[in-house]
Amino acid sequence: DLLDVRSAIQQGKRERSLRLGLGYERFTDGQLSDSWATGIFPNIQIGCHPEAIFLMRFLPHDTDPQKFWYDTMTLMFPVDDPNYCPPAWMGLPENTDVTGRNRAPTESYLKDEDPGLGLVLGQDAAFLPSVQEGMSSKAFQGQLWGEQEQRLRHFHVELEKRLGIQQS
């Protein structure tokens, strides 16, 4: 049963937090088990989890409108405990320093290379080329915006009007 699974995840994370001093008492049950994601600006997504925050940024290619750059960053609170290991689905390399003393190097990968992003971001990255291809489909008639995105879009339209920026 799905509720039993969610409850077990929540309970397990709370027990682990107490054992390792992670401070998860600040989180609701839903924040412990569910993926809380939000978009800011049209090209940035933030996935919030107790273990870390994923930042994903999509930038247009400088010369080819059929291409884009996909940047990801994983931010986490330092944990000074040798027994702590981030969940494997987060895609952090084994033996990642979670103490905050050493910053992991920036890595770059091309489209056909496996960046080892982990289960969640790996699935997202694998899906992106087909999304980009769909943008050129004859059936594509424009984006469907959720309420948050509509508000952001409206804000930027109004801001550009007030700044006197010509809209295309």
Spell out what each predicted region is.
Residues 1-168:
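C-terminal catalytic domain of Rieske-type non-heme iron oxygenases
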